[in-house]
Amino acid sequence: MRPVSGDPPTDPSSERPLRAGDWVEVRSLAEIRATLDGEGRRNGFLFMPEMVPFCGRRFQVSKRAEKTCYGSRFLRVGGAVHLAGARCNGSAHDGCELQCLTFWREEWLRRVDGPQEVGNRPAAAPVGRSAGGGSAVATGRPAALPTRVDSPGDGTVFICQATALRDVTREPVGAWNPRPYFHEIHVGNAGWAEAKQLIRWSLAWGRLRVFKAFSRQQSTPKAPRERIDVGDWVEVRSAPEILATLTKFGKNRGLRLSEDMLTFCGERFRVERSVTRFIDETTGRMKVMQSPCLVLESATCRGFNILCPRAQFHFWRPEWLRRLDGSSGAPPPDSPAGKPPPRT
């Protein structure tokens, strides 16, 4: 494991670490490259080709990256933030469709007063193929931004920020340890309103745990499946309806339903896209789904259990959704601008 430095601030112009709501400008590619080691990393955090187009642009900090999920574990990180809307498009990783929220070291950012960009935005360098088979930014430093390792006998293993999380993590975070929750409030990632949502997640966790304990369903049950297309408006079905489609392991055709997903029951969203391929962050292998899943606009993991800020998109089976009548085109009248109805 690579050494991890202490939590910054690392921008000498800042008087405190960046917090949610702060505005920043991503430094130029040349400035960022000057902070990277020979593997294109800074303290374990990988800078990817997909992040190059963000150079010179301004974003609002969505959360500090104090902790993260990795596989089935929760781990503490630090010294980085997430930027609102700055997601990986998978273009340098064979079209991975996860659209992960990227991690940004504070050294890669410059604090600014607001969203308005002054002057010309620096041009992004083109992304090309390196001699070793990976992708690299064409800036005169071959393979500076690797994306994969090709082995004749072992196939392709991808390298990205998600697969590299094991190199930046410090120690595991216990879901029942109260200290991380208070820390999230202290750094501005959450308020008491978010902390109260732990009750909502706990109820979903208990319901799913009881289901798994008493279910005897070995294979995926047959369930009505509507045709749902990209652009349709849908409502997440009730917990009993969704649980009726699962095996005793909490899966539907191999896809696991998480406790967090049960907190979306009754809410309405528009279908953003379908997903067929993604990189498994624990192995670096590309997985191709036999049955495509659906992604809903803004339906990302809320991280209620440990207030994780990673905001990964959930994958949904059509059986878990109800298509709203006449849903193509404009949003339903009781779901203005595509937002879910207020929670009660």
What are these language model-derived features?
Residues 2-20, 29-127, 140-204, 208-230, ...:
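Basic/aromatic-rich interaction segments and small domains that mediate binding to polyanionic partners
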